[in-house]
Amino acid sequence: TYCNTETEQIVSFKEQYDSESIIKWYRELVAGFKKWMDYVFDERAERNASIQKLHFPFEYREGQKKLVASVYHTVKEQKVLYIQAPTGVGKTISTVYPAVQSCSNGLTDKIFYLTSKTITRTVAEETYAILRDAGLHFRTVTLTAKDKICHLDEHNCNPEVCEYARGHFDRVNEAVYDIITNEAVINRDTILQYSVKHKVCPYEMSLDVSYWCDGIICDYNYAFDPDSSLKRYFGDGGKGNYVFLVDEAHNLVDRARQMYSATLVKEDFLKCKNLVKDIDKRLASSLEKCNKYMLSLKRMCDKEYII
């Protein structure tokens, strides 16, 4: 039944189906969901079993065992822990290991390893690799910025321009299922490989893939930036037991200032004024006032001191 919201005209189409065809349709519909639920059930069981058998992969250094215990109890009590220690003492493995342990008993749904640099993302990947070598079954994805993973030289998401955007949603489910059932380590190269295979947008596919992964390695922005954060996890209605391992957290202060700060450029006001001066004199006058005010601020900043 369709209703025209303007005229309130109602048009109905009536169809008759026998019970056999309805049952067949329903079973096909459920079968489409069943393979995903089977994946979640089987993967979670295998992951939890591997975690229960997992041991710390090195001999504990001085203070390291205490650090591991502190991280685990912090996760369990849903509190915040700030760790300051010299480079090379094993902070990464000492935080990732207890976070992984918390996944097997329902404390944690997903681990976010947040970084400010590409090189530290590599450290996180290597740490997970060490745990996999020790027997861990744990799927991770490393998220890459859209402009760094796009197949086009200049990304354009218009389906008429990008062949990977054209028909993306018709193919992405199969692409995601393919990659998560065949790869445990999903990074930029893996995403690009499967996006070419299935002709889907690599960036959007990586976000969909993250839903089915145990660990997500990504930039601070994906968690904290109000414009770039992953709405599927942190938007309205997004809810889950997540652990955040914030690498080099002291860098987050400056990044947060940038995320929550806006910038106005004086030259932009001048350009806009010149564009509209022959069309809307009132608007041009307002833009000129803004330009003059910002010029006065600029001159003020040029002074060595202000009284």
Residue ranges and their predicted role:
Residues 79-83, 109-111, 215-218, 242-244:
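Generic beta-sheet signal
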Residues 18-52:
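Polybasic (Lys/Arg-rich)
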Residues 47-49, 54, 107-216, 221-224, ...:
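A substrate-engagement module of RecA-like helicase motors
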Residues 95, 101, 122, 126, ...:
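Signature of the SF2 helicase/ATPase Hel1-core->accessory helical subdomain module
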Residues 76-98, 110:
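Walker A/P-loop
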Residues 41-84:
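Conserved pre-motif I regulatory segment
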Residues 72-73, 92-107, 127-131:
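Walker A/P-loop NTP-binding motif
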Residues 1-23:
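Nucleic-acid nuclease catalytic cores
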